[in-house]
Design a protein with these regions (language model features):
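Aromatic/acidic polysaccharide-binding cleft in carbohydrate-active enzymes
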Residues: 241-328
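Helix C-cap/helix->beta junction micro-motif
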Residues: 76, 166, 228-231, 277
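Short alpha-helical segments and helix-capping/turn motifs at coil-helix boundaries
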Residues: 5-14, 64-68, 116-119, 187, ...
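Boundary/entry segment of secreted carbohydrate-active catalytic domains
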Residues: 1-31
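Glycoside hydrolase catalytic-domain groove-lining segments
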Residues: 200-251, 273, 280, 284, ...
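Active-site mouth loops of central-metabolism enzymes
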Residues: 1-8, 98-100, 253-256
Length: 328
């Protein structure tokens, strides 16, 4: 959501968020958006810019614009789903997606971000943020993680165990994989099981032009969780949208469809289909107001697009605490 107390250029979409009863806002890629605080927001390298600094000192952290951004999410009525890590980097030079120099120190930094947000540390807040996600798409072709899979397995283990020992009451999970890739996922789950790594939720992504692909992947990911003993772990699809191709005319058609009535119908269809699967949460990508994949809000004016309405209707059903049956 966008909100500012400036005297000018102060358009907001908070009323639309409230009306749609959107339950969660995920913070991933928020640092790509100037209106959210840009390169001073959410990501570990933005909040803790000098990795050689003291992670136990409040002076090492810059929470200012992240706090403002999370305040706006609270104003919208949504709860925060916080991604610990860094935004995607499509550039030829990378800045925040390399393996941290010290995995344990990185976990301690994450700990103090949570303490600031939930326990008031460093002039902080008591936001009660429950979901804390470790990284994003570590399996995605050096755009989110430049290290090896084995290095990521170590980072995930160290961070999950440390955070769970500090905060047993919150939910720790991840790693927001970009797709169902058994060659990456099976070694990940084998290591997590062998090392007894706690995982309260498991997050994953799916982009497709076919509703049945979302059903298929939901079942595949759930089967992996159950196979490796994570039977009580939540399965969360927290990036999804209509995509029929990632380049050329396919990508052009994808973006056009996301803004169309067909894109809106697709949102409703996927949400409805997944309602009948063993899936705990869906998070549409993207409501970021400068994103070309945003089928909900127009850039600049922040007026709603067609894709907003199925989410609004879903929010109404969420308030009724039950699925609505239609008789034809």
């Amino acid at each position: 959501p966008v909100y500012t107390e400036n005297a000018d250029q102060n358009l907001t979409n908070l009323p639309y968020f409230k009306e749609a009863n959107i339950p969660y806002a995920r913070t991933h890629d928020s640092s790509i958006c100037y209106d959210y605080g840009g390169e001073h927001t959410v990501d570990i390298i933005n909040i803790f810019p000098d990795f050689d600094a003291d992670p136990y000192s409040p002076e090492s952290y810059d929470f200012t614009l992240t706090d403002m951004y999370l305040d706006n999410i609270a104003r919208s009525g949504a709860r925060v789903f916080y991604r610990l890590g860094n935004k995607i980097e499509h550039w030829p030079k990378h800045y925040g997606i390399m393996p941290p120099k010290d995995f344990k120190k990185w976990a301690v930094i994450c700990e103090h971000i949570i303490r600031h947000m939930n326990e008031g540390w460093a002039n902080g807040y008591n936001r009660g943020i429950v979901y804390w996600e470790i990284w994003n798409e570590p399996d995605f072709n050096n755009k989110c993680w430049t290290g090896t899979p084995e290095e990521f397995f170590d980072l995930f283990e160290i961070t999950a165990k440390h955070l769970k020992s500090c905060f047993p009451e919150i939910k720790i999970g991840g790693p927001a994989v970009c797709r169902y890739n058994a060659d990456w996922l099976i070694p990940f789950f084998e290591e997590m099981k062998k090392r007894n790594v706690p995982m309260d939720f498991y997050s994953w992504h799916c982009y497709s032009s076919k509703v049945e692909d979302f059903i298929r992947d939901t079942r595949l990911h759930r089967a992996l969780l159950d196979r490796y003993g994570y039977n009580e772990c939540e399965s969360i699809l927290n990036e999804w949208n209509y995509v029929c191709g990632w380049s050329g005319e396919g990508w052009k058609k994808s973006l056009a469809t996301e803004l169309s009535i067909k894109g809106a119908a697709f949102i409703a269809a996927v949400a409805t289909a997944c309602q009948h699967e063993k899936l705990d949460m869906l998070m549409y990508y993207d409501a970021r107001i400068n994103s070309t994949m945003n089928g909900l809000f127009r850039p600049g004016t922040l007026e709603v697009r067609k894709g907003y309405y199925p989410l609004k209707i879903w929010g109404e059903m969420l308030s009724s605490d039950g699925e609505c049956e239609t008789l034809c």
